Structures are given as structure tokens and as C-alpha cells.
Amino acid sequence: MMPRTIIEKIWDRHVVKSGEGKPDLLYIDLHLIHEVTSPQAFEGLRQKGRKVRRPQNTFATMDHNIPTVNRFDIKDEVAKRQVTALERNCEEFGVRLADLHSADQGIVHVVGPELGLTLPGKTIVCGDSHTSTHGAFGALAFGIGTSEVEHVLSTQTLWQQRPKTLEIRVDGTLQKGVTAKDVILSVIGKYGVKFGTGYVIEYTGEVFRNMSMDERMTVCNMSIEAGARAGLIAPDDTTIEYCKNRKYAPKGEEFEKAAAEWKALKTDPGAVYDHSIVLDGSEISPMVTWGVNPGMVLPVDAQIPAPETIDSEDGKKEAIRAYEYMGISPNQKIEDIKVEHVFIGSCTNSRMTDLRQAADMIKGRKVADSVRAIVVPGSQSVKQQAEEEGLHRVFLEAGFEWRESGCSMCLSMNNDVVPEGERCASTSNRNFEGRQGKGARTHLVSPAMAAMAAIHGHFVDVRKFYQEKTVV
């Protein structure tokens, strides 16, 4: 057999039916659902008289619409109906649900891994763009639309076009203060938001190998922002250690057998990718987005680009539009940009590693008077663990708000929105126009960079913090 990439191996193992020049029918190992993209799918099953094909392979939680202050006080009628519908649908169709009373509730892409539902080698889908998060475990995970949600519920399969393979290799050693978020933002900034179109990415190299699972999830989460269908990292000892003793993971001898198979799941020597990119991690800086997509990003010590420095006419027009919407000017220093809001959370950066990183920045300091800062743990489990470690006290004493788990300010589908014309340093994954609220201005950053912005009221190079610590 020809040498194959891990992407091809997982794909081939799950093909139920294929035909020359046609999409493949893939078996889906895990289907994650939430309250926003599932109601129409369940209604479709009901109208057709169908059942959920594999309820044991389906897991639901509530995350997008729910409040993070008083989680039971859902004021928006549409949101309330969606939450109620999910409860009713899961009960009727026999699907496991982590509802608002459950200790397992949280953002779907946070709870899937922490419960041991996400495992290496699986095919995983969810009606959400950032399903690629689960690729951190060496799984093939991608977002699907509502009609596809119904198809998977009723058949446990999905028609998909075989993707091309893209290797992104990052070697070297990251500078102190440079994080997984900076790595993926740097990649997107260098190659654009469309370069991954038609590909599934495998992230390789020592930078990714040295990352924790939380950090790997941050990287894979933003694969979609590069235009890719999915992104993954081959499983290793770090992966296996994370999966051990998780609620739904195999136990005992079954786990040891599975772990041996997972460690063998990797790209063969001599396998050829359709395209490869190699980067030096030591050259990556803390990053800040300045425009209206994740590709409009620069090192924190840079200046907003002037139109004449942009090669394409379309790029110039996009930049001019971004200046206006974001309320910024060409040649303005990133570090001179002031913020009114800071959001630490989302499926990109709301795990323990992220919260510890932010808490390290703010310990003994105070949020600037001009800033409103909130921390939203990615799950009830993360919230509990953070409180056991005392992180919540660090945030509260600094002047942050400490919330319940949910998607929160990542998107304007709940009570947490950025007011029109105001600016937010956010650890989320999208800075599109209106993403955090009508007229909201979003700058994507790492948790450490967000924490520093909260303290100073403007962007600050987090590397200075570590330099000061070294001097002291």
C-alpha cells in the first residue's frame, strides 16, 4: 500500500460507499449538537417519521444562547424556544443532553474533549463552524449545516468530497509570551483566510508537539478561519494522557488497547501532501487583529498598514473599509489602540491553560477604570476547577466579572454584546463586522494579551511582562 497521511487513513477507514468522481459516504462516529442548529433537523425527522439512527453516538449541550450571569433567565423568546426545543427533542429521540442543570454543560467544543467523547481516529461533526477544534486529538472533525445535521441524525453518515491534504509545519522555539493563538493567527495573517480552501490541514513540527492539548485545540479551532475544512494533530503521549480516565473514554485494558492504536495513527514516512508550508516558530510575535477578518492581523509592535503598502486593489479596498468600521488610521501603532471591553472565553480560549495564562498576567493588578472585562469559563467543569485553584479570586480581585459557562460574547446571540462603536480585545475566533454586536469592533488576541489590555486599557506587548519578571 502507498504511504498515506493520517488524514487519508482516517478518511479511508470511514468510507461506506464511494464512486469515481463522486463524493464519499462517510460513517460518522460522533455527532455533537446544540440548541441553535438542531431544532429544524429534529423537526425534519419528526415529519418523516424517522428516529435517530445512533443515539449513543450523539451528544447535546446548550451553549450559544444561554445567559452567563443568571443562566435560567433567558429573555430572548427565540433563544428560549430553542433551548426548550432541545430539551424536548433529546427526551423524545433518546439523545444524551447536558442541560443547564448538568455539571457536564458547557461549550460543545469544550465539553466533547473533557468528557472523553472526542477521541483519536474518530470522525466528528457538529452544526457549528469550529468543530475542527476536535482535530487536536487526531480526529477528523468538521462543521455541517442544518440539513446535514438531519442527515447524520437519521443515517449516521454524510456525503463528503474527499479533501486535499495540507501540512503546516512549525519548528523552533516560541518566544516567552507567544502562544498557540499567536501561532495560528500568524499563519492566517501570512497566507490569508482562503489558502486552506479544499484542504484538511495536518499541523506538524516541534512547536505543536510541545503544546498542551488545550493549546492544540486553540490551533485546530481556527483552521476554518484559514478556509480549511478541518485541521488535526496526530495523537501522541500528550493526547493519550489527556484522554485517560475521561468519563466516556475506554477504561482499563480497553483503554490500553485503544492507546496503542492511537499512537500508531500517524502519517507514514514518505507520504506526500498536496501542499506543505514550513515556518520558524521563533519568528512569531504576539498578534493582534486590526481589521474585519482574522487574516487582517499584525504583531503587537507593528503599525496599521497604509493602503499604498497593500499589493492588490481588492486588498486596498478591504483595508479602507476596515479603517472606517474599526475606527483606526493607517500607520497607527497597534499599542496605541485603546479598548473598552475585554472578553476571555469562547471555544478558542476558555480552558484551564487559557485561564491560568490570563491570571498570571493580572495577579496583583487592577483592570483599568475605562475597561469592562469578563471571564467566561468554557464549561462548568472548567469553572469548578478554576475555582478550586483560586483563579476566580484572582480575576475578581482585579476587577473582572466571573461568569457561568457559555459562548457568551463570542457572538451576539445572547445577553453579552459589545455596544455599537465600542472596542473589544477578545480571545474568540472571528472579528467580522457585527460579530460581537451591531457596530462592535473586535480585536482577536491571546488570553495573555487580552489580560494585559484589560490592565492597561490598550494593547501592550506581553513579552514586556516576562522581561520585567526576569529583571525582578
From Swiss-Prot:
Pathway: Amino-acid biosynthesis; L-leucine biosynthesis; L-leucine from 3-methyl-2-oxobutanoate: step 2/4. CDD domains: IPMI. It comes from the Bacteria. Its cofactor is [4Fe-4S] cluster. Belongs to the aconitase/IPM isomerase family. LeuC type 1 subfamily. HAMAP family: LeuC_type1 (MF_01026). This is 3-isopropylmalate dehydratase large subunit. It comes from Bacillus velezensis (strain DSM 23117 / BGSC 10A6 / LMG 26770 / FZB42) (Bacillus amyloliquefaciens subsp. plantarum). The lineage of its organism: Bacteria, Bacillati, Bacillota, Bacilli, Bacillales.
